[in-house]
Design a protein with these regions (language model features):
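Iron-sulfur cluster-binding electron-transfer modules in prokaryotic oxidoreductases
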Residues: 1-203
Length: 204
């Protein structure tokens, strides 16, 4: 059994991603639940220096997922906040630190959960397209989830997976970074788009 942490972006902009995650997990025999009390993980306010507000949101998440066996997150950024930075937020509060460490141990990014916990690399799907893969920065650098998405993609039948030049370079989004430094963000995105287009892939 696993609990889905839906993330703000999935909830507000891409709900179909959440639906797809649930479908994939259920096809693998996972009983998925969706704790109703969940809210933002607190990363945007934490990255903006508002640690007090971040703690309030984090405490809500700790309480909401306290009984979950696994917490599956379709976002490297949110998963990193919960796994890496919640213990840092509560390092001076022994009781909450223990709760943060307990949650940290059961938080998994989606592809990581499939490969590491379920032991699944072949989902039994096919797609006769060409694709290239961009690894998200938080997923790559903070969670160290590097190979799991590629293992899954390489098992997609008929899919031609093309290498992305400078794949590990940031796309320029970085959450609040793109708002605080829009011109730098646009430049980084421009470089990323050029590299993606150079592959000739149908899908990113």
């Amino acid at each position: 059994k696993a609990s889905l942490f839906v993330t703000c972006i999935v909830d507000q902009l891409y709900p179909e991603v959440g639906v797809s995650v649930v479908r994939v997990l259920r096809r693998q025999g996972v009983d998925v639940d969706f704790p109703q009390g969940q809210t933002c993980c607190g990363q945007p306010v934490y990255n903006s220096g508002f640690t007090g507000q971040a703690r309030l949101l984090a405490r809500r998440v700790l309480s909401t997922f306290a009984e979950s066996r696994y917490v599956v997150v379709p976002s490297g950024s949110c998963a990193a906040m919960m796994r890496v930075f919640y213990p840092e937020l509560f390092k001076d509060d022994p009781a909450l630190l223990r709760q943060a460490q307990e949650l940290s141990a059961k938080v998994y990014e989606f592809s990581e959960f499939l490969v590491k916990v379920l032991g699944v690399e072949d989902l039994g799907v096919s797609n006769p397209d060409t694709a290239t893969y961009h690894p998200g920065c938080h997923q790559l650098r903070e969670l160290e989830v590097r190979d799991e998405p590629l293992k899954l993609l390489r098992q997609v039948g008929s899919l031609e997976l093309r290498d992305l030049p400078h794949a590990e370079s940031c796309c320029g989004f970085g959450g609040a970074f793109s708002v605080k430094f829009p011109h730098i963000s646009e430049g980084m995105l421009s470089d990323k788009v050029k590299n993606v287009m150079s592959t000739g892939a149908d899908t990113l």
